[in-house]
Each structure stands twice: as C-alpha cells, then as structure tokens.
C-alpha cells in the first residue's frame, strides 16, 4: 500500500489528486499524519478525493489507526488513515 505523508502545510487539493490517482492505480492508499493540523488537511483531502471518485461510482472508506514513528531520532505518535474503495 502506498503511503502519502501529509503535513499541516499540505494543499488538500493536491493531496486529494494524489490520493485518487493512487487508489485508481493500486486499489488502496494510506495517509500518514503527525499533529492536528496535518490530520485536518488529510481529512479535507479525503473529502475532496471522495468527490473526485464519486462520478465513476467509487465510494471511499477510511480506517484510522495510531502508529509510532521515529522522526529525527525521536519517537512520535502518528495517525494513519487507510483508504480503500467501498
């Protein structure tokens, strides 16, 4: 599954386009976020991507999960959003 990392500065429209492309190509994708701002951008991107995919009859579902990552030598808690067609 391809992992798309989302930051608080990510453009939701750009993330949505990438997300829709990965799902069309590979069937599923994962958004990885650290922090509330990044999670906010990821959820907006998911809503936009759902709109991109709806005309072709594809609905998206999201399964959130916590995960621990090592960033610059420090352990951080991240939220993963596993996205797949319904």
Q: Model-flagged regions — what are they?
A:
Residues 10-12, 37, 68-70:
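Residues that cap or initiate secondary-structure elements
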Residues 4, 32, 51:
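Flexible, active-site-adjacent loop/turn segments at secondary-structure boundaries
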Residues 24-41:
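Charged, well-structured alpha/beta interaction segments
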């Amino acid at each position: 599954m391809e992992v798309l990392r989302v930051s608080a500065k990510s453009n939701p429209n750009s993330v949505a386009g990438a997300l829709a492309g990965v799902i069309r190509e590979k069937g599923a994708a994962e958004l990885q976020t650290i922090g509330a701002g990044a999670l906010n951008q990821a959820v907006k991107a998911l809503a936009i991507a759902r709109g991109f995919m709806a005309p072709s009859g594809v609905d998206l579902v999201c399964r959130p999960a916590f995960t621990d990552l090592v960033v610059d030598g420090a352990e951080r808690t991240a939220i993963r959003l596993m996205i797949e067609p319904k």
